[in-house]
Amino acid sequence: MEKYKILECIGHGSFGRIYKVQRLKDGALLAQKEIHFGNITRQEKQYIADEVNILRNLKHPNIVQYCGEELNRSAQVINLYMEYCGHGDLANLIQRYKEEKKRFTEQEVLKFFTQLLLALYRCHYGENAPACDSQWPREIFHPKQSVLHRDIKPANIFLDENNSVKLGDFGLSKLLDNTRVFTQSYVGTPYYMSPEIIRSSPYSAKSDVWALGCVIFEICMLTHPFEGRSYLELQRNICQGNLSCWDHHYSDDVFLLIRHCLEVNSDLRPTTYQLLRSPILSDIRSKLESERVVLEQSDLLHKKHQMLIQLENDLQFREQRLSARESELENVIASRLAQREEILRRELEKQLRDMDARYQRHMQTVVNSMQKMRVTSPVDHNEQPESSTAEMFVDCTIEASQSPLLHIPKLGISKPLQTLSCPGFTLTTQQPILKRPTLRKELSSRALHTTATLMKYRANASSLRTTPIDKDGQITSLQQKNGTSNQVADCMNKLLHTSLDGKKLSPSELCNKFSDGEGLPNRKVSKLSVESDETAVSASSGESVPTDSTLTDTKSKSVFVHPPSPQSLYVEKLEKLNIRSDEVSKPSKASKTLHGYALPSLASPYDVHAEEKIARENEMDGNFKTMKINQHPDEYVLRTPKKIQLLEGQKRSPVKQLGRLGYNKLRRSAMDNAGLELRKAASTSNYTSLQSRTLPGSWRDDEEEIPRPFLRKMLDARMMRA
């Protein structure tokens, strides 16, 4: 790292150039003396070393201050840094005055002379001269070290900004100790050479005084004191003391001082100690000391001011660096915040996109599900509702009437299906958990089978059975005894006994009327849920309800008690399969029956006790082993719609699908037992024996027989399902 900055070249020395430089750490101006030692002799190198050693130890206000050296071995250059004197050397000043034909004042001459004496005193005696008002030591005092300049001339005397004299360029100076008072060698300028040097006498401190006298004479007269056409003539004039010229422009005191310094006899020549004690120089010295104190104070203040300025500059520089650092930190923080905000924004956008994608997928799923499961309420009863069998609801309102006419409840979608209560077994209220596609397919198949089967049996008058009546001739119901009411059983009771108790119609007439759709609401449904006829209620005529013994004891009653109809047996199977669900599915085409009608059903909110159910189931299993079948030739083919006939001939019929789901339960049902008896009777073709085998409370005498084709198709369907 560079410590100095070169400003300009200010001169040439004995061994190189002299530059004006600036010290970077404090801005002080210095003079850099460049000395190349690569091509110089050993003696010249010793001169350089001596000068460096001398300058390190010489510190005086009138001596050029040594500031340091810098060695560059690669370039073989040594740089000496000394105090910079802004007004140049004394030789240039004399030349300028000579050109301008100006003369120095006597005070200026005495001032230069006194300052040079003080500098030589420091070199000769090794210490500063005592103050002018103090006690001077004796002249016999010998300093420990003495320095002989040996090259005092105007070119080696410098002036600073205050025109103070600075003695410099100690390149030819010789360091003497106490044992070596004189030196035999001399190298200097001939115009300032002392007589003893010309006579080859030893060189002493008084030789520097001779050179000082020559310099003061040149300052006064602006010319050399000794002149000659040749070197010999110059030497002769120096040895004789013949001065070139002298005018009376200055006082005699000045001339006497110069004359004493140019004494040819060195023994009579005064020393610096004697010259400083002269009265004429004492006054000048006092003034110089006063000026020096003022200058020192001024320099001190100036240095302090410069120091303050430097501190202010440093503080300002640090403030600028701090401000730049703050702005840089702010930019870094802002950039990092911006990056963080960008990252958070991207993450938030990604989350929003993910949420939107999930929402879109969810909405698409919901839309697809709603498109598959959408249910819209019909405007009127003539409009087909867009609902599946599981979405069908039943209106629980039944018109109460005292008339024995048949009143069938209307089907609607206002209320959900309730839990069915069937006699002979206990049903749980927990709904089976099925997946949506499986449930939709299963419910559609079950609804198709339910509707097709009921429509098939509805065409036969032999499927209509009556219920027991009590002693007073009124129709009774088991559940009325338990304090409950079943509207589906009431409707079935009314439907089955209208011909006998109401309008006295025959089974054939009732079948025809029922097939024509009389008394049924003009509404299409997709699923039928009915209940066992064991829970039938009395008709609107207000007949009483018989007890359970009416079903089993045939001898105690005089009226005929018919076995359960195929509708009730089929309902019992559905109940054992626990087919109940509120899930939504689209209506299937197979759910549309003949004329769009199906028997309505309502769910009973109450169940009988478990023991009574088991007892009834056992009784039903024992009582329905034989049936009386009335034959009606080709009634099934004539009255059954073509759609039902086709459905029964399908490869995968609803009956087969329903049989897959509940095979074990169906085999244990009463209908399977009755179906097996019918199958055996059909295989033996013993219709008379089948007719003679009647259940307790036998069939009615005027009841028509089931046609053989219808019976065979029914049994084939049961066997296929099993």
From Swiss-Prot:
Catalyses which reaction(s): L-seryl-[protein] + ATP = O-phospho-L-seryl-[protein] + ADP + H(+); L-threonyl-[protein] + ATP = O-phospho-L-threonyl-[protein] + ADP + H(+)
Compartments, as annotated in UniProt: Cytoplasm, Cytoskeleton, Microtubule organizing center, Spindle pole body
Compositional bias annotation for Polar residues: 535-546
Location, primary (coarse class): cytoplasm
Gene Ontology CC entries for this record: cytoplasm; cytosol; mitotic spindle; mitotic spindle pole body; nuclear envelope; nucleus
InterPro entries recorded: Kinase-like_dom_sf, NEK_Ser/Thr_kinase_NIMA, Prot_kinase_dom, Ser/Thr_kinase_AS
Entries under Gene3D superfamilies matching the protein: Phosphorylase Kinase, domain 1 (3.30.200.20), Transferase(Phosphotransferase) domain 1 (1.10.510.10)
Molecular function, one GO term: ATP binding
Entry keyword ATP-binding: yes
Enzyme Commission number(s) of this protein: 2.7.11.1
Keywords: ATP-binding, Cell cycle, Cell division, Cytoplasm, Cytoskeleton, Kinase, Mitosis, Nucleotide-binding, Serine/threonine-protein kinase, Transferase
EC class: transferase
Record: residues binding ATP: 10-18, 33
Highest taxon, organism lineage: Eukaryota
Active site positions, chain numbering: 151 (proton acceptor)
Protein's GO biological process: cell division; chromosome segregation; negative regulation of septation initiation signaling; nuclear envelope organization; positive regulation of G2/M transition of mitotic cell cycle
Location of region: Disordered: 528-557
SUPFAM superfamilies in UniProt: Protein kinase-like (PK-like)
Pfam families, alphabetized: Pkinase
Record-annotated Protein kinase domain positions: 4-281
Known role: Promotes chromosome condensation and nuclear envelope dynamics during mitosis. Activity appears at metaphase-anaphase transition.
Family listed: Belongs to the protein kinase superfamily. Ser/Thr protein kinase family. NIMA subfamily.
Stated name of the protein: G2-specific protein kinase fin1
The species this protein was found in: Schizosaccharomyces pombe (strain 972 / ATCC 24843)
Organismal lineage: Eukaryota, Fungi, Dikarya, Ascomycota, Taphrinomycotina
Gene symbol of the encoding locus: fin1
